[in-house]
């Protein structure tokens, strides 16, 4: 029989337990996802779906199912962006507003706990992270999906030029600046139009030339192309990393008489906005030279986030060191990484994320359940290369730049190196639709496989 005192103690204990559980739920997660971008949101949904569908105890008899709130997502951004849409924005086919949703709207509270903060530091030896406010969040398993840092400050004078509305310097590589690109393309009637691409790592390495081809086509359609000298300065040794598609791009430049002047191993290092001059460094001999411009589309350098580069998770390049097949950290087995923040040796695109995510999720689930990591990522990535209004080359390839085309079996009459309207509408209409309605809504989009998830052996 309970006494009054024991009842009070019981009730008090229940409140204390509830308080402790509430605090625990907000600071500890079985799975913690760092990043609320394309990779983070997609993979969080897939993790939830996988662990909900396959609920059973692991070999040690431990319940490995995930309950609502046991997956945490850490990201301080207010908005989530469909960044592949910024090329369309720059071409006048969309707007930044159409590529934007509030991040919280993509993180249903009945599944996930959103921590609206940025990460300050990672402590994988202690299974925790620290946010900018100083909050510590611990985890059993960590998924790194933090994206890449766009370093505008590395090019002297670039930020100042972009912030000046009277200076014809633009970029599609930021939600802050992408809407200004198309108006400047419209206003340019003559002179020198320069488009740049930095050396080194870059998210969507085809985008710097996509916007160039779209601008060139716009000027041609509006009968001013003959008045404009169009140049592309790239810090890379080739126009595109895969020879098959690089050759196709060069072929259409020559055969269609587009007359874009392509300069290799020349990197933009400074923008003199008031003088309308761009300073380049030749990467072969280190020499500097200037070029005047009437329109400059500049692509900033990119690098790993500092909190990753300075952590024990990083490889020598500053990205998360992972096994290129399993996406598991090579340093801490309870850590996985996908997307732009990972050291996976493939092009950093959203298409790559769609192929990496189910592999990572299956291997995480297998690891939690004491199984072998049987899913393998083959490096698949894709770059829908806009070459003009109504035209697109659909580049798809694996590790080592080996082409792997979705329509390869139909290549006799559907060559993916030939710009086609069908491919154009995939980029312009279909991909944005499936992104918002499947990929970040419920995680049920698997890239080249469409709505059909891959199946991996369990052993």
From Swiss-Prot:
Residues binding FAD, per UniProt: 35-39
A GO CC term assigned to this protein in UniProt: mitochondrion
Cofactor: binding comment: Binds 1 FAD per subunit.
The protein's required cofactors: FAD
GO biological process terms, semicolon-separated: cellular detoxification of cadmium ion; cellular response to cadmium ion; glutathione biosynthetic process; phytochelatin biosynthetic process; sulfide oxidation, using sulfide:quinone oxidoreductase
UniProt entry keywords in alphabetical sequence: Cadmium, FAD, Flavoprotein, Mitochondrion, Oxidoreductase, Quinone, Transit peptide
Domain of life where this protein originates: Eukaryota
Record's subcellular location: Mitochondrion
Active site: 204, 383
Enzyme class: oxidoreductase
GO molecular function terms attached to this record: FAD binding; quinone binding; sulfide:quinone oxidoreductase activity
Transit peptide, UniProt annotation: 1-24
EC number: 1.8.5.-
Main function: Catalyzes the oxidation of hydrogen sulfide, with the help of a quinone.
Family (UniProt): Belongs to the SQRD family.
Name under which the protein is recorded: Sulfide:quinone oxidoreductase, mitochondrial
Lineage of origin: Eukaryota, Fungi, Dikarya, Ascomycota, Taphrinomycotina
Gene name for this UniProt entry: hmt2
